[in-house]
């Protein structure tokens, strides 16, 4: 529940490497304490996650696998029951009865989230992984920025496709500026 990697997850992925998988990508790992999409999910939002990540990266490398950690934020799909707060989204979202189910992100929060993705990538690199996969599908936060129904913003992060893409672009640029040249970003 605290995002620390379990022995079962390490064993499961290491077994894939021992079986000859050349590239191993972890399950989605939340970059923010309040971005968890489901119970028991792996986290990369705190330095306390680095020891477990290091153990996994070492075991995968010892079995000749390239290793990536998939990073994401659940956005409006981060249940309030798990995160103790109303979910966030590029724009406010309401259910059919008009109840707010996700609140709109402030610009300062968007910048904080870009930093969360960047810091998560740094933790992944410090742990010894070969790279990250930025999860931008399945209606999670990045996908919500790209969508016209979930992103009705009137600022630099909304409107045109170029603006809706800006959140992901800013994440990639920010990460690339701080990780090593050979660190993979997919």
Could you tell me what each predicted segment is?
Residues 158-185:
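Active-site neighborhood of glycoside hydrolase catalytic domains
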Residues 70, 135-137, 143:
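Generic beta-strand/beta-sheet core signal
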Residues 23, 66-70, 131-133, 182-186:
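Structural preference for beta-strand elements that scaffold enzyme active sites
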Residues 30, 73-75, 136-138:
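Active-site-proximal loop/turn and secondary-structure-junction residues that shape catalytic pockets
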Residues 31, 44, 79-105, 145-165:
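Aromatic- and acidic-residue-enriched carbohydrate-binding clefts of CAZyme catalytic domains
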Residues 55-58, 119, 170-177:
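Alpha-helical scaffolding segments of alpha/beta enzyme cores, especially the outer helices
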Residues 58, 66, 72-129:
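Non-globular sequence segments
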Residues 1-72, 113, 121:
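N-terminal capping/small domains of soluble enzymes
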